[in-house]
Amino acid sequence: MPAVLLVLYVNPPPSVCILTQKLSLGLYNQWWRVCRSVPPPWYVFFNKRSMSTFKLMMDGRLVFAMAIAILSVVLSCGTCEKAKRAVRGRQDRPKEFPPPRYNYTILTRYNATALASPFINDQVKNVDLRIVTATRPCEMIALIAKTNIDSILKELAAAQKTYSARLTWFKIMPTCATPIHDVSYMKCNPKLSFAMCDERSDILWQASLITMAAETDDELGLVLAAPAHSASGLYRRVIEIDGRRIYTDFSVTIPSERCPIAFEQNFGNPDRCKTPEQYSRGEVFTRRFLGEFNFPQGEHMTWLKFWFVYDGGNLPVQFYEAQAFARPVPPDNHPGFDSVESEITQNKTDPKPGQADPKPNQPFKWPSIKHLAPRLDEVDEVIEPVTKPPKTSKSNSTFVGISVGLGIAGLVLVGVILYVCLRRKKELKKSAQNGLTRLRSTFKDVKYTQLP
């Protein structure tokens, strides 16, 4: 039994959080059968003629009850953060929420539109690629990149017409793409900022990302709080404005060190990860596998930061735009006007006798566009940087030390109790075999006098 408790303490399953009290009660009842020769606890407190508290502790009942209580507290407080995080919103709330950017009406019918394919068929299309690298585990990162949306909105404003838009984030996998966030906008005024529209659809999120992801203030970027290593890879943002699409790729790298407050993600689930053929046939409806989370952007971001700090994370001072992919610069000897002019000069001057002709400049081979913007076949090949070990928090280390100490103390107490109870039972059995009956010394304190 102590070994089982030790395993549950080191690596408990999610059900431990709910069944901790029942487990403690069950162990208590099972051990009561071994130590049933000892009076129950309430006999001590309600019967003045009971045996002393010291004798009760030696028999093991009170000590065992204290050990079970200590182990229950350790199991429920030290190992159930993930389960408590899902329901703590009802218990803890941020003090203030920012006002919404604008007022809008949510209409569910906009979610009935099939999702366009995130895959790019044009092999020469230039896609903006950004690099996002987390320097340590349990870090909050942002996927931010400026676009040419303002020029499109100016054209629409000059034409004096409203527009409709759709913003979707995808996690690109080797053979499929998983939508993780989707929202549609209708009746938008081009004179205002993007997404400030009168109507919009339900705000859809992948359920496992609600407590670890949120939109930036302009609703164009994505903030990830303490992402796990499984969140590494390629993310693609698709902005569609009146049929025109803008693609932006983010190559995200997360350290392989384990983060205790991170949630592992399964982006390759076939129920959500759709193939290019399914997108082309118009079979992808995000309403079927994404969950609603109709909180305004400011309120959602406030919740995200609150949960992150509650779990022990450190908020960044400011979110910066992701670094653009450094495109290669052509070398000095690439074919151009200078090389053509030098060739003409060389043709006019004859080389000296006995001197070999100089070797012509090798033409520069431009890299394939596939290396500038990773495509479907190599989206998850992310180079992991060499990171320093994460800084350990004093509060976390202190709590872990106290928890381990309490657990060891509880196990020692359980072992002592088991030894005392088994020895007592053995003595009673031996006395019964010898024909001796153990009598309770109820009157052991009565003074005896010799009769005349």
UniProtKB/Swiss-Prot annotation:
Side Virion surface, residues: 20-405
CDD domains, sorted: TM_EGFR-like
Compartments where located: Virion membrane
Keywords per UniProt: Disulfide bond, Glycoprotein, Host-virus interaction, Membrane, Signal, Transmembrane, Transmembrane helix, Viral attachment to host cell, Viral attachment to host entry receptor, Viral envelope protein, Virion, Virus entry into host cell
Disulfide bonds: 138-259, 176-273, 188-197
GO BP field: entry receptor-mediated virion attachment to host cell; symbiont entry into host cell
Glycosylated residues (UniProt): 103, 111, 347, 396
Bilayer-crossing regions: 406-422
A GO cellular component entry from the record: virion membrane
A Pfam family it matches: Herpes_glycop_D
Primary location class: virion
Intravirion side: 423-452
Signal sequence extent: 1-19
Annotated family: Belongs to the herpesviridae glycoprotein D family.
UniProt function note: Envelope glycoprotein that binds to host cell entry receptors, promoting the virus entry into host cells. May trigger fusion with host membrane, by recruiting the fusion machinery composed of gB and gH/gL.
Name of the protein described by the UniProt record: Envelope glycoprotein D
Source organism per UniProt: Equine herpesvirus 1 (strain Ab4p) (EHV-1)
